[in-house]
Amino acid sequence: MDEKCISKAVIRRLPRYYRYLGELLEDGVERISSNELSTKMRVTASQIRQDLNNFGGFGQQGYGYNVQYLYTEIGKILGLDRTHNMIIIGAGNLGQALANYVQFEKRGFKVVGIFDVNPVLKGISIRGNEILMMDELPQYLKDNDVQIAALTLPKNNAEETANLLVENGIKAIWNFAHLDLEVPEDVIVENVHLSESLMRLSYNLNCYVTEHKK
């Protein structure tokens, strides 16, 4: 099936499958049934089978799923069988935290550059990458093969910076700014609004507290 036809809900579950299957491999588990997967994933076994059937199924009736094979195949679907070079725009607390996160490289995401407008930060090294100034960005992108930019800027700077990234060939933006970016159709954006996640947590906590007061 063409992956463009697959629902966003399915795509958002794939990293969870991948993470859990990786944990199973670390524990030495070689095979697992859809029922066992459903318990951990908190979705029905039927839903798991439907999700995986979008990509060919991968299971065998009466056997379940080969954990190593399924882990490898989902990794390929997620594009984790290749290295993606990534730059970080904004070297504040969040940008530095992303730059220091070692798990990215284990998943094939290599941070190759960090940029900021603050001259005080220029030249500071984070895991081997010296912070560069934003006016160096266009030439850097011409000279280097970069697929992804993580945007960790204030809201008022994000749109202009996103336009600069697009103009210089970036096709995927991981956006942590507090707005939804408007980009051309051929540019992929993943918006990560941390405050919205916290508000959902607050809602669920409020529901829990209200329910247990009854």
Show where each model-derived region lies.
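Glycine-rich Rossmann-fold phosphate-binding loop(s) that bind the pyrophosphate
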Residues: A91-G92
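Extreme N-terminal segment that seeds HTH/winged-HTH DNA-binding domains in transcriptional regulators
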Residues: M1-E30
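N-terminal Rossmann-fold NAD(P) dinucleotide-binding loop
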Residues: G95
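NAD(P)-binding Rossmann-fold cofactor-contacting core
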Residues: E105-R127
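HTH-adjacent hinge/linker in prokaryotic transcriptional regulators
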Residues: R31, N35, K40-T83
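Phosphate-bearing ligand-interacting subdomains
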Residues: G22-E26, R127-K214
